[in-house]
Amino acid sequence: MRAARIETCGLPPVVADRPAPVPGPGETLVEVRAAPITPLDLLCATGSSYFGTPTLPYVPGVQGVGTADGRPVWFPTPAGMAAGDGSMAGLASVRAEDLVELPPEADPYAVAALGLSAVAAHMALTWRGELALGEQVLVLGAGGVVGQAAVQLARLAGVRRVVAGARSPAGQERAKRAGADAVVALDTDDVTDLAIRFSAACDGPVDLVLDPSSAPRQRPRPAPCARAAAWSTWAARRPRPARSTPPRCAAARSGCSVTPTTS
């Protein structure tokens, strides 16, 4: 089979023929259809990640989409983080318990591009953030895949307003295309200036903040959130009146489709 192979950390992979993997106990052979190149793949390939130097050579690819026994599946791998090969090959041997079966109509390329990023956005909004109908949401880092997914998922959930923050002009444009009602340029470190921008973009207090940027928790909060929501990486919300059954967002109770954009 053809596979990408990291032979030297810090250098591009080499594409070459390689023997097909032999599944071990509890593993399943997956015919790979799509494999994204994620930031984690790039980090592991440098040899300087927090997982340590990977055993060389190895096939990169920490996640992918393919078919197993005729079923469309999404799958993760430990490539670059532990011994073993990844998804950037014609075939991959994956633990059967790690396979996530997909609907037959799912676009394998869209699912591969979204992957864990869309799951992270969905979980942050719904499980951690308890997003409810009619709320106002602020998404930082909205030009990245997690941020774009969060903007679209929030829209599908029936929020009243989505405000996005992105640093680069390209990221701001991606956030707009994802459906943000307003986009704040994060191109300055002037806290007062940023507070003015957020205040102008937000329609009153923000109910939920999603921050996938892994920034320090002590960073200044946008002014509309200062009185209401404690700051937290990933998701934080302002207190709301107690109610017996909070209205569940549409994205939490039904299937939804989000679209990755990188250009």
Regions found by a protein language model. Give the residues of each.
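Glycine-rich beta-strand-centered segment in the early N-terminal region that forms part
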Residues: 19-37, 48-82, 86
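NAD(P)H dinucleotide-binding glycine-rich loop of Rossmann-like/cofactor-binding domains
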Residues: 73-141
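N-terminal Rossmann-like NAD(P) cofactor-binding module of classical short-chain dehydrogenase/reductase
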Residues: 74, 209-210, 232
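Short, glycine/polar-rich helix-capping loops at beta-to-alpha or helix-loop-helix junctions
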Residues: 88, 166-174, 240-246
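Mid-domain Rossmann-like dinucleotide-binding core that forms the NAD(H)/NADP(H) cofactor-binding site
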Residues: 111-188
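NAD(P)H cofactor-binding loop motif with strongest signal on the N-terminal glycine-rich segment
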Residues: 141-142, 213, 236
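Glycine-rich phosphate-binding loop and adjacent beta-alpha segment
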Residues: 159, 216-263
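Short amphipathic alpha-helix with an adjacent loop that forms part of the alpha/beta core around
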Residues: 191-203
